[in-house]
């Protein structure tokens, strides 16, 4: 099984951007965590990050066209992007929404997700370990 782990705007700056909120883990560390977890689980993973909404939409179309499960941290797009929602809604394989911080303990606008109601599941506020949990669930569900 192959899984796409898709990360939205500013996640490439992990470890530099608001470490009090997102922790000191760098984006490279996140990629290593996902790749290591995938290896342990015997699945293939491709981790991507973009600051460009159209690129994210294209990746979601790719997942939809190839029946690939997705771990999606759409970051700020979670809270306002109808385009990302519409693309994500075309993914028929499981789609897990992940957020590093607990968005419900932050600014009010972050509590609204355009994705949660179309996601298979949501992992919020467990740091980067949420990605590993999402991958583990996907691997167990595919058995």
Curated annotation (Swiss-Prot):
Q: Which reaction does it catalyse?
A: 3-dehydroquinate = 3-dehydroshikimate + H2O
Which CDD domains does the protein's record reference?
DHQase_II
UniProt signal peptide: none
Pathway(s): Metabolic intermediate biosynthesis; chorismate biosynthesis; chorismate from D-erythrose 4-phosphate and phosphoenolpyruvate: step 3/7
Which PROSITE patterns does the entry link to?
A: DEHYDROQUINASE_II
Enumerate the Gene3D superfamilies for this protein: Dehydroquinase, class II
* EC numbers, comma separated: 4.2.1.10
User: One short Pfam family name for this protein?
Assistant: DHquinase_II
Which SUPFAM superfamilies does this chain map to?
A: Type II 3-dehydroquinate dehydratase
Query: At what residues does the UniProt record annotate the site feature described as Transition state stabilizer?
Result: 17
Keywords, in A-Z order: Amino-acid biosynthesis, Aromatic amino acid biosynthesis, Lyase
Q: Catalytic residues per the record?
A: 22 (proton acceptor), 99 (proton donor)
What is the top-level taxon of the source organism? Answer: Bacteria
Q: Give the UniProt record's GO annotations in the biological process aspect.
A: amino acid biosynthetic process; aromatic amino acid family biosynthetic process; chorismate biosynthetic process; quinate catabolic process
Q: Does the keyword Lyase apply?
A: yes
Its EC top class is lyase
* A single MF term (Gene Ontology): 3-dehydroquinate dehydratase activity
Q: Where does substrate bind?
A: 73, 79, 86, 100-101, 110
Q: What does this protein do?
A: Catalyzes a trans-dehydration via an enolate intermediate.
- Family stated for the protein in its record: Belongs to the type-II 3-dehydroquinase family.
This protein's assembly is summarised as: Homododecamer.
What's the protein here called? 3-dehydroquinate dehydratase
Q: Which gene encodes it?
A: aroQ
């Amino acid at each position: 099984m192959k899984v796409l782990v898709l990360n939205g705007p500013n996640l490439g700056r992990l470890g530099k951007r608001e470490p009090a909120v997102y922790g000191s883990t760098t984006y490279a560390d996140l990629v290593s965590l996902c790749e290591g977890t995938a290896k342990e689980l015997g699945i293939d993973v491709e981790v991507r990050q973009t600051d460009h909404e159209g690129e994210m939409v294209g990746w979601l179309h790719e997942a939809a066209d190839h029946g690939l499960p997705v771990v999606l941290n759409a970051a700020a797009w979670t809270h306002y992007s109808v385009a990302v929602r519409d693309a994500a809604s075309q993914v028929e394989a499981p789609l897990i929404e992940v957020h590093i911080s607990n968005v419900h303990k932050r600014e009010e606008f972050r509590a609204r997700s355009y994705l949660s109601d179309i996601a298979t599941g949501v992992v919020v506020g467990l740091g980067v370990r949420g990605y590993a949990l999402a991958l583990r669930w996907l691997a167990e569900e595919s058995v």
